[in-house]
């Protein structure tokens, strides 16, 4: 007879491309970042709201199901009632649904912030993930571009609160209406050209990544990347490509001259001229508030999402870091936003003015590490005090030590593995513990009453490199390990912790 039983295949312990794990240090640093961003947003009068990870696909708006599944860009699946559901690809579209659903109950303007993970079903690459964290703030119900100017000011203040020095960043502002005026001038006006307009805008959005030559290919026939993948272009004629690139590269000495350059580029387009007028108003508000050195008009800013309808802005870090090829490169964008007056209106049949700003938390974490911000470079908190288990028949007694420490607001854990004393001490050291609590039969049966041994793990490590002077060595050893009465456990642990505070 033969045994038909087969060993099941072992599961592969690896992540899908574009996803990553985070350890305690990164989580702690991220929490500090979120706290700083939250404090800045709240200083400007925004309040928290939270929406779920999953929405109806049609509520997200931009991506709709085709015959088999929703278009690329989102992770989607069918519910048991045949409805398409999707993981959110940003935090703005879910906010629009929330505002529309609760419109009559919310104050207007409605000022809110929210943080969380978003998901993109896109090709991953270096620094490009399928799951990443954003932190948004939005004002809904404010038609004035003063709300857009405020977003830019808040973005600047938030970066400085996070430890980015003035001069190491710039908030760049443009207006989709100006871009629309340029596109009208090259024959891409009207609803029939909406798709090509978005292709052009997304091509311009890649200027920092691909440079003018790469953008020219995306505006024209298309571009093939290093892997051989081909991205279809907008199919513009050469003269139209040159006109778009000339607009994007437009420069001016100061705001007034830049506005003049933009007016000339949209001459004859009512929508384009309206956009330039809005930029002029934003510039005046920024100057009056004292932010003109930190915020500037830049025609290369487009933002890649379709729902923007007016001013758009981008937070860019201007310092250089080492690129993948070892050469210095500008760090680039870590957030952005803009006006989206039609997004809430999709649910209400009328436009509702809205504007917002989003920080890419995951990308910003890398940036703050690069500039040595104390928010992410500060040492992580020590591990818990570890109570060793030397005699399992006294487990309840050891648990009592842990409870006493926790009752005193001291992080503590009972060792729950099956190893001996030396391995337990190594475990405590790996956990980053400041000290370990030890009680064997010698301490428990002490003539003067039950005692515990406190081992200062950091001082213990220093003993190896201690002075050869015997008196100094003995003094250090006495501090590194000492015994106290059981009832003095908490005070003794606090003494050790105070040495490292």
Swiss-Prot record:
Homodimer. GO terms for molecular function: ATP binding; histidine-tRNA ligase activity. It comes from Methylocella silvestris (strain DSM 15510 / CIP 108128 / LMG 27833 / NCIMB 13906 / BL2). It comes from the Bacteria. Belongs to the class-II aminoacyl-tRNA synthetase family. InterPro entries: aa-tRNA-synth_II (IPR006195), aa-tRNA-synth_II/BPL/LPL (IPR045864), Anticodon-bd (IPR004154), Anticodon-bd_dom_sf (IPR036621), His-tRNA-ligase (IPR015807), HisRS-like_core (IPR041715), HisRS/HisZ (IPR004516). Keywords: Aminoacyl-tRNA synthetase, ATP-binding, Cytoplasm, Ligase, Nucleotide-binding, Protein biosynthesis. PROSITE patterns: AA_TRNA_LIGASE_II. PANTHER family: HISTIDINE--TRNA LIGASE, HISTIDYL-TRNA SYNTHETASE. GO terms for cellular component: cytoplasm. One of its GO terms (biological process) is histidyl-tRNA aminoacylation. NCBIfam families: hisS. Its EC number is 6.1.1.21. It is found in: Cytoplasm. HAMAP family: His_tRNA_synth (MF_00127). It catalyses: tRNA(His) + L-histidine + ATP = L-histidyl-tRNA(His) + AMP + diphosphate + H(+). This is Histidine--tRNA ligase. Its main location: cytoplasm.
């Amino acid at each position: 007879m033969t045994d038909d039983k087969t060993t099941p295949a072992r599961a592969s312990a690896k992540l899908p491309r574009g996803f990553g794990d985070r350890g305690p240090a990164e989580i702690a640093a991220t929490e500090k970042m979120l706290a700083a961003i939250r404090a800045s947003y709240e200083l400007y009068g925004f309040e928290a709201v939270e929406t779920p990870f999953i929405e109806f696909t049609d509520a997200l708006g931009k991506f709709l199901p085709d015959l088999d599944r929703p278009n690329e860009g989102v992770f989607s699946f069918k519910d048991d009632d045949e409805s398409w559901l999707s993981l959110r690809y940003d935090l703005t579209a879910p906010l629009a649904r929330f505002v529309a659903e609760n419109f009559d109950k919310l104050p207007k303007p409605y000022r809110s912030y929210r943080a969380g993970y978003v998901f993109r079903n896109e090709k991953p690459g270096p620094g490009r993930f399928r799951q990443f964290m954003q932190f948004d703030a939005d004002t809904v119900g404010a038609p004035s571009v003063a709300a857009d100017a405020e977003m830019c000011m808040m973005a600047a203040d938030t970066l400085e609160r996070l430890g980015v020095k003035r001069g190491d960043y710039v908030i760049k502002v443009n207006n989709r209406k100006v871009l629309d005026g340029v596109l009208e001038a090259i024959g891409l006006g009207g609803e029939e050209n909406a798709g090509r307009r978005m292709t052009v805008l997304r091509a311009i959005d890649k200027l920092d990544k691909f440079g003018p030559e790469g953008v020219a290919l995306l505006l024209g026939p298309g571009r093939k990347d290093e892997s051989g993948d081909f991205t279809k272009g907008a199919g513009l004629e050469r003269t139209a490509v040159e006109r778009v690139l000339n607009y994007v590269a437009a420069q001016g000495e100061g705001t007034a001259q830049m506005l003049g350059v933009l007016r000339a580029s949209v001459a004859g387009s009512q929508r384009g001229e309206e956009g330039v007028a809005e930029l002029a108003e934003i510039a005046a508000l920024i100057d009056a508030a004292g932010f003109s050195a930190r915020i500037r008009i830049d025609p290369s800013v487009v933002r890649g999402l379709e729902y923007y309808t007016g001013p758009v802005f981008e937070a860019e870090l201007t310092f250089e870091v080492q690129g993948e090829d070892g050469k210095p490169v500008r760090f680039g964008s870590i957030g952005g936003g803009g006006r989206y007056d039609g997004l809430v209106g999709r649910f209400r049949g009328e436009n509702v003015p809205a504007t917002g700003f989003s920080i890419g938390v995951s990308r910003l974490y890398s940036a703050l590490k690069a500039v040595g911000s104390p928010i992410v470079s500060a040492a992580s908190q020590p591990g818990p005090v570890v109570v060793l288990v030397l005699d399992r028949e006294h487990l309840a007694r050891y648990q009592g030590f842990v409870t006493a420490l926790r009752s005193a607001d001291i992080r503590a854990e009972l060792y729950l593995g099956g190893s001996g004393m030396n391995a337990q001490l190594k475990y405590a050291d790996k956990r980053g513990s400041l000290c370990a609590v030890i009680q064997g039969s010698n301490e428990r049966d002490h003539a003067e009453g039950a005692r515990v041994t406190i081992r200062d793990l950091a001082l213990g490590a220093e003993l190896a490199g201690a002075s050869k002077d015997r008196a100094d060595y003995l003094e250090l050893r006495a501090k590194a390990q000492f015994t106290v009465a059981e009832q003095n456990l908490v005070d003794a642990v606090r003494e050790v912790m105070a040495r490292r505070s």
